[in-house]
């Protein structure tokens, strides 16, 4: 899955 917001930190992916 994608994590598309700033709170994801290093996991941010769009």
Curated annotation (Swiss-Prot):
<keyword id="KW-0964">Secreted</keyword>
<dbReference type="GO" id="GO:0030550">
    <property type="term" value="F:acetylcholine receptor inhibitor activity"/>
</dbReference>
<comment type="function">
    <text>Alpha-conotoxins act on postsynaptic membranes, they bind to the nicotinic acetylcholine receptors (nAChR) and thus inhibit them. Specifically blocks mammalian nAChR at the alpha-1/delta binding site. Shows very low potency in blocking the alpha-1/gamma binding site.</text>
</comment>
<dbReference type="GO" id="GO:0035792">
    <property type="term" value="C:host cell postsynaptic membrane"/>
</dbReference>
<keyword id="KW-1015">Disulfide bond</keyword>
<dbReference type="GO" id="GO:0090729">
    <property type="term" value="F:toxin activity"/>
</dbReference>
<feature type="modified residue" description="Cysteine amide">
    <location>
        <position position="14"/>
    </location>
</feature>
<comment type="similarity">
    <text>Belongs to the conotoxin A superfamily.</text>
</comment>
<keyword id="KW-0629">Postsynaptic neurotoxin</keyword>
<keyword id="KW-0027">Amidation</keyword>
<dbReference type="GO" id="GO:0099106">
    <property type="term" value="F:ion channel regulator activity"/>
</dbReference>
<keyword id="KW-0872">Ion channel impairing toxin</keyword>
<keyword id="KW-0008">Acetylcholine receptor inhibiting toxin</keyword>
<keyword id="KW-0528">Neurotoxin</keyword>
<protein>
    <recommendedName>
        <fullName>Alpha-conotoxin MI</fullName>
    </recommendedName>
</protein>
<keyword id="KW-0800">Toxin</keyword>
<feature type="disulfide bond">
    <location>
        <begin position="3"/>
        <end position="8"/>
    </location>
</feature>
<feature type="disulfide bond">
    <location>
        <begin position="4"/>
        <end position="14"/>
    </location>
</feature>
<dbReference type="InterPro" id="IPR018072">
    <property type="entry name" value="Conotoxin_a-typ_CS"/>
</dbReference>
<dbReference type="GO" id="GO:0005576">
    <property type="term" value="C:extracellular region"/>
</dbReference>
């Amino acid at each position: 899955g994608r994590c598309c917001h700033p709170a994801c930190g290093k996991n941010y992916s769009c």
